[in-house]
UniProtKB/Swiss-Prot annotation:
Record text on cofactor binding: Binds 1 Mg(2+) ion per subunit. May bind a second metal ion at a regulatory site, or after substrate binding.
Cysteine disulfide partners in this protein: none
Function of the protein: Endonuclease that specifically degrades the RNA of RNA-DNA hybrids.
Binding site for Mg(2+) 1: D12, E50, D72
Catalyses which reaction(s): Endonucleolytic cleavage to 5'-phosphomonoester
Subunit description: Monomer.
CDD domains per record: RNase_HI_prokaryote_like (cd09278)
Species: Shewanella sp. (strain MR-4)
Keyword Hydrolase recorded: yes
Binding positions (Mg(2+) 2): D12, D136
Name of the featured protein: Ribonuclease H
Cofactor(s) essential for the protein: Mg(2+)
Encoding gene (name): rnhA
Compartments, as annotated in UniProt: Cytoplasm
Length: 158
């Protein structure tokens, strides 16, 4: 069996107003090469952007990889490493028997993660971590660029 490529991925999400215009930022490092990605949406939430960032990054990988994925989102990290197992057993319901929020993105993240060996790491945001700060800049710039793209899965709280 061949050795899997080791990719370092850093992600962040941003939202102005929450809900409001939002964006995500991604920095990917592989053997000294860096790739940056970002995009914005007209109306979304911070949590949706925190989920979409790792989804886009993982879906961009062309083959199974060993991934160290670092984010400042406890919501995303806790969800994908801990909460998701219970949600799936309960038919995507929370322990309070309410539907899981952002279920479209959780399902997509779960599917994207299955293809890779991922070490999910957390870093404190706005604490001088270079790649996280760059992701924050990319995400904020995407949110501030008057995005027109629609976040199809966003549903306003009723």
């Amino acid at each position: 069996m061949t050795e899997l490529k080791l990719i370092h991925i850093f992600t962040d999400g941003s939202c102005l107003g929450n809900p409001g215009p939002g964006g995500y930022g991604i920095v990917m490092n592989y053997k000294g090469h860096t790739k940056e990605m970002s995009d914005g949406f007209a109306l979304t939430t911070n949590n949706r952007m925190e989920l979409l960032a790792p989804i886009v990054a993982l879906e961009a990988l062309k083959e199974p990889c060993k991934v160290i994925l670092t984010s400042d989102s406890q919501y995303m990290r806790q969800g994908i490493t801990t909460w998701i197992h219970g949600w799936k057993k309960k038919g995507w319901m929370t322990s309070n028997r309410t539907p899981v929020k952002n279920v479209d993105l959780w399902k997509r993240l779960d599917k994207a993660a299955q293809l890779h060996h991922i070490d999910w790491r957390w870093v404190k945001g706005h604490a001088g971590h270079a790649e996280n700060e760059r992701c924050d800049q990319l995400a904020r710039a995407a949110a501030e660029a008057s995005p027109t793209q629609i976040d199809e899965g966003y549903q306003a709280e009723s």
